[in-house]
Amino acid sequence: MSHNTFGHLFRVTTFGESHGPAIGCVVDGCPPLIPIDEADIQTFLDLRRPGTSRFTTQRQEADRVRILSGVFTDEASGKQVSTGTPIALLIENTDQRSKDYDAIKNLYRPGHADFAYDAKYGLRDHRGGGRSSARETATRVAAGAIARKVVADVTIRGALVQMGPHKINRDAWDWDETTRNPFFCPDAKAAAFFETYLDDIRKAGSSIGAVIEIVAENVPAGWGAPLYGKLDADLASGLMSINAVKGVEIGEGFDAAALSGEANADEMRIGSLGEPVFLSNHAGGILGGISTGQPLVMRFAVKPTSSILQPRHTIDRSGHESEIVTKGRHDPCVGIRAVPVGEAMVACVLADHFLRHRGQIGEGAVWPANRSR
């Protein structure tokens, strides 16, 4: 299996399966002398960790990360810092229940990657989906914690803004609220509704989808490159690579198709300090594949968890029709834990584009340098 690596200068390779002994990643391209310790990474892993509420899978994984390489204690500061060499991170699996999947070993689970993997490789790991499991995303969160250090001036935050057909009230948006409820929801009233709503879905043995919004602030103008290195293209690719994601939009996204040209274009003025000021942000902070200095705004849609307790029609590996009920421990709304995963992927893409921009352009801002020409 190829394509287990993403990024150009900041490169992440992940490895491991859902029911294997461990999962992990190797981060290559991290600059030297960046303070990194396991506690920094663990903070973000704990946000994604399973079994933290009744609304996520009850698989109990501590997700304790170990740094195996790429760091050294700096004698001058006494801190553990990156050396510039590959950083290997390992997370052990401790709560696998492979026997839960014995009954469906030869059955394809509808909505899962079972059939597609078998069609391509001639085999599949039926134990929790193996490599196709969302368990792999813990390694992305670990890599994202390092990426955040590379772009330390950038603030990256995510929120669940829709569950099923129910959207939050954007006028009630409060980022602090995302830390007060199990849904990473910025609307307190919506979070209270989601609690009852998802309880009913969970008790019925079903699942539901969600929409996640990620906002990255303090990204300077100039990151990204035309035509085939566009920042929004790489962000979309990173977010689409997350398990169960079926759609990504930047800024107004698909709603832009319903707007007129004058409504969609972000008009500009000169601010009090001579800086460019945008009067709106329909573009989501990216024009021509290059950041504008405005907040980057993106959303991705997560489909309902395919593993449910409702019986469904399927076929087996021998070509016989059958019925399947997927047992085991699964998220009733996988979109909840996709929030820190989405943040991590955005962080990795931004770290990569920061290094690519610095390598081509240098540290200086381009726009002010061009004003006198």
Curated annotation (Swiss-Prot):
Gene3D superfamilies: Chorismate synthase AroC
Group of enzyme by EC: lyase
Cofactor or coenzyme needed: FMNH2
InterPro entries hit by this protein: Chorismate_synth, Chorismate_synth_AroC_sf, Chorismate_synthase_CS
UniProt: NADP(+) binding residues: 48, 54
Keywords, comma-separated and alphabetical: Amino-acid biosynthesis, Aromatic amino acid biosynthesis, FAD, Flavoprotein, FMN, Lyase, NADP
SUPFAM superfamilies (UniProt xref): Chorismate synthase, AroC
Reactions catalysed according to its record: 5-O-(1-carboxyvinyl)-3-phosphoshikimate = chorismate + phosphate
UniProt GO BP: amino acid biosynthetic process; aromatic amino acid family biosynthetic process; chorismate biosynthetic process
This enzyme's EC code(s): 4.2.3.5
Known pathway: Metabolic intermediate biosynthesis; chorismate biosynthesis; chorismate from D-erythrose 4-phosphate and phosphoenolpyruvate: step 7/7
Binding site for FMN: 131-133, 243-244, 288, 303-307, 329
Subunit structure: Homotetramer.
Family indicated by similarity: Belongs to the chorismate synthase family.
Function: This reaction introduces a second double bond into the aromatic ring system.
UniProt protein name: Chorismate synthase
